[in-house]
Amino acid sequence: MAARIGSMAGLLCVRWWSSAQLAARGGPLVASQRWAGSSADTVYDVVVSGGGLVGSAMACALGHDIHFHDKKILLLEAGPKKALEKLSETYSNRVSSISPGSTTLLSSFGAWDHICNMRCKAFRRMQVWDSCSEALIMFDRDNLDDMGYIVENDVIMYALTKQLEAVADRVKVLYESKAVGYSWPGAFSMADSSPWVHITLGDGSTLQTKLLIGADGHKSGVRQAAGIQNVSWKYDQSAVVATLHLSEATENNVAWQRFLPSGPIALLPLSDTLSSLVWSTSHEHAAELVSMDEEEFVDAINSAFWSDVHHTDFVDSASAMVRHAVALLKPTKVSARQLPPSIAKVDAKSRALFPLGLGHAAEYVRPRVALIGDAAHRIHPLAGQGVNMGFGDISSLVHHLSTAAFNGKDLGSMSHLTGYETDRQRHNTALLAATDLLKRLYSTSATPLVLLRTWGLQATNAVSPLKEQIMAFASK
């Protein structure tokens, strides 16, 4: 494990100021292809490859940016256009936790209004606790502001599609279109006059762009074609998702997460009577969960949240001593453990599973190319930050590109792309490392490690300024 973490740390560091790295970035990105630009090719200022949540939001943000009013933007999406004529009464099992920072981005180009007019559920508190002890941490806001929102991915996608249609004169969307080849010129200088990226689509057509943005997922074709190294490994876990019905209606404004020895289980509010499940566990157990009958599955969920079977007297006694000491030092505002709502049933056909892993690109940018979202990083869902990291990438990249456009600079120049990389690698690397450490620390019931994490969680819960810093970091 130490070797792996050391390897990860070495590859995650930002090395763009090294002259050797700059020379490498200026080299050919696809060695087997020669620069074959044609004056007949359609030319775009920006091409976004990948029309998922992050790619579509990127195109939206650029299309609505005042300094891009005279730019041509293209969004490539391999799938068909998704129409949402009427909101289904059944909730989707794929949801995202949207942070305040992400709502600011979505509001900046009008998508958040569409989301609020459809459906989303705010949560004002988050309780995280250990199944092997009484340790917990409660995140909340004294001013009663919302900590975040749980939104179905389909709803977010609908809102983004509506806002893309609003800027159709600036942003062209090609559905059922996928790039199958990229050509960069050979070694060239960092000057603004460097040649553009040449893209071949599946139908044989070609185009050119001043900046290619890869938003095509953790198996990114843009990243691979650019020859950007990616540190990645698969976790020994899959995530089980489902839509759950509560036993009784509640205010349901708390997000719950409990760390089990096999992985974390989370309950995210959807409405007063519904919640979304994300249960990370071993591949074998995940397969069992999705194949169980409904009653057995519901019992397994309630037991996972309520049972104290993993407790030991020794750890409970040590935990109680620390808890009493904290109460003496800080007799007020110590969060008390609450219990999550019980589950009554599960929506039919809402159960699904997907494998988990970690990934991080050693570089986010090369001349005329930038990576965002899962193309640049992949994270465990225990942090609830996957799409928020991607939206954070967008906020940073749009800021740098907007400044470049305002100043009449070349959009594909490294002079501002490296600013984006520095901003986001600093944030994302810290979050990835912390999440990976938590995943490993809580994937054991060994007494010494249980004690260590118990005391750490209790201490963190008692220090309000530290919790505020954690919430502020996660809200970006």
Swiss-Prot record:
One of its GO terms (molecular function) is oxidoreductase activity, acting on paired donors, with incorporation or reduction of molecular oxygen, reduced flavin or flavoprotein as one donor, and incorporation of one atom of oxygen. It is found in: Mitochondrion inner membrane; Golgi apparatus; Cell projection. Its main location: mitochondrion. One of its GO terms (biological process) is ubiquinone biosynthetic process. Residues 1-35 form a transit peptide. The modification N6-succinyllysine is found at residue 219. Keywords: Cell projection, FAD, Flavoprotein, Golgi apparatus, Membrane, Mitochondrion, Mitochondrion inner membrane, Monooxygenase, Oxidoreductase, Transit peptide, Ubiquinone biosynthesis. Its cofactor is FAD. Its EC number is 1.14.15.45, 1.14.15.46. It holds the Pfam family FAD_binding_3. Belongs to the UbiH/COQ6 family. FAD-dependent monooxygenase required for two non-consecutive steps during ubiquinone biosynthesis. Required for the C5-ring hydroxylation during ubiquinone biosynthesis by catalyzing the hydroxylation of 4-hydroxy-3-(all-trans-decaprenyl)benzoic acid to 3,4-dihydroxy-5-(all-trans-decaprenyl)benzoic acid. Also acts downstream of COQ4, for the C1-hydroxylation during ubiquinone biosynthesis by catalyzing the hydroxylation of 2-methoxy-6-(all-trans-decaprenyl)phenol to 2-methoxy-6-(all-trans-decaprenyl)benzene-1,4-diol. This is Ubiquinone biosynthesis monooxygenase COQ6, mitochondrial. It comes from Mus musculus (Mouse). The gene is Coq6.
